[in-house]
Amino acid sequence: MLVTDKKKEIITTHKLHDSDTGSPEVQIALLTERIIYLTEHFKVHKKDHHSRRGLLKIVGQRRRLLDYLKKKDVERYRSIIEKLGIRR
């Protein structure tokens, strides 16, 4: 689960300006961290299908944000993909 300190750290590394918490880059980074956490969770709890559905929803949400960012600004899209190591 994302602890407050970890969440603040992610926001500070990906923010565009001082009070930025909702830019697509920040949202994508937070969702990516949750996806990584849940992926590790499923290595131990293979039969947790309820949470697996939540993971699929999070992946879909991140995909929509990435598509939006790609449509609006390709350079920002490429930089966030490279920073987070997301395959596309």
From Swiss-Prot:
InterPro entries: Ribosomal_uS15, Ribosomal_uS15_bac-type, uS15_NS1_RNA-bd_sf. Gene3D superfamilies: 6.10.250.3130, S15/NS1, RNA-binding. Signal peptide: none annotated. One of its GO terms (biological process) is translation. The keyword rRNA-binding applies. SUPFAM superfamilies: S15/NS1 RNA-binding domain (SSF47060). SMART domains: Ribosomal_S15. Coiled coil: none annotated. One of its GO terms (cellular component) is cytosolic small ribosomal subunit. One of its GO terms (molecular function) is structural constituent of ribosome. Keywords: Ribonucleoprotein, Ribosomal protein, RNA-binding, rRNA-binding. It comes from the Bacteria. Part of the 30S ribosomal subunit. Forms a bridge to the 50S subunit in the 70S ribosome, contacting the 23S rRNA. Belongs to the universal ribosomal protein uS15 family. One of the primary rRNA binding proteins, it binds directly to 16S rRNA where it helps nucleate assembly of the platform of the 30S subunit by binding and bridging several RNA helices of the 16S rRNA. Forms an intersubunit bridge (bridge B4) with the 23S rRNA of the 50S subunit in the ribosome. HAMAP family: Ribosomal_uS15_B. This is Small ribosomal subunit protein uS15.
